[in-house]
Swiss-Prot record:
This is Sorbitol-6-phosphate 2-dehydrogenase. Its EC number is 1.1.1.140. Pathway: Carbohydrate metabolism; D-sorbitol degradation; D-fructose 6-phosphate from D-sorbitol 6-phosphate: step 1/1. It catalyses: D-sorbitol 6-phosphate + NAD(+) = beta-D-fructose 6-phosphate + NADH + H(+). GO terms for molecular function: identical protein binding; oxidoreductase activity, acting on the CH-OH group of donors, NAD or NADP as acceptor; sorbitol-6-phosphate 2-dehydrogenase activity. Keywords: NAD, Oxidoreductase. SUPFAM superfamilies: NAD(P)-binding Rossmann-fold domains (SSF51735). It comes from the Bacteria. The keyword NAD applies. InterPro entries: NAD(P)-bd_dom_sf, Sc_DH/Rdtase_CS, SDR_fam. NAD(+) binds at residues 4-33. Homotetramer. Substrate binds at S141.
Amino acid sequence: MNQVAVVIGGGQTLGAFLCHGLAAEGYRVAVVDIQSDKAANVAQEINAEYGESMAYGFGADATSEQSVLALSRGVDEIFGRVDLLVYSAGIAKAAFISDFQLGDFDRSLQVNLVGYFLCAREFSRLMIRDGIQGRIIQINSKSGKVGSKHNSGYSAAKFGGVGLTQSLALDLAEYGITVHSLMLGNLLKSPMFQSLLPQYATKLGIKPDQVEQYYIDKVPLKRGCDYQDVLNMLLFYASPKASYCTGQSINVTGGQVMF
């Protein structure tokens, strides 16, 4: 396989797991993270396991147009093509609406939505230039389908991501490029979720060590979403088997969201 995947937010947590999983399937991987040292470390791990030149680390700020333009040029110079873009960058801040700071709201929109737009715009250019019927996949959340209490900034951005995905799918269909959002359930063991335990405990009026079980009880399949669940869906929608699907918001929620 000579296919190249670009993973935004690939230097840590879920993004790093997806980079390793894509490399295991034969993709060459551009590991992109705002923390360039983390991107370089993941790329080094992949090269050590799967062979030299399988991965390269890039430092980039997805919310900066100039940074994304430079990233696109860098990926093009090193890999010469792009077949798959995965937008896995994201942040969340929980607060009651009257306490929610404008700066936090705006930052959520920038990272969760504007960065997705910039990366999709620039990397779809490369796909179109080379006649590649590529794939663009946004890592979204069930909060992009159902409002989330005390998470107005995050949920607003994720709802916006669904609209952007559908619009991109319509724009790019004539080039055979498909676009999807994966709507994840709670990644209970992820650093992002774990960092929010105290805020969620306060919101729910329970102890921090009770938060995970509270969310598990809401899921029909009675467990949280795992990184492997996300990778499984990503690999399918990136594959030729899903070539007739585009513009979809795919639930990976254990049945918690069914529309």
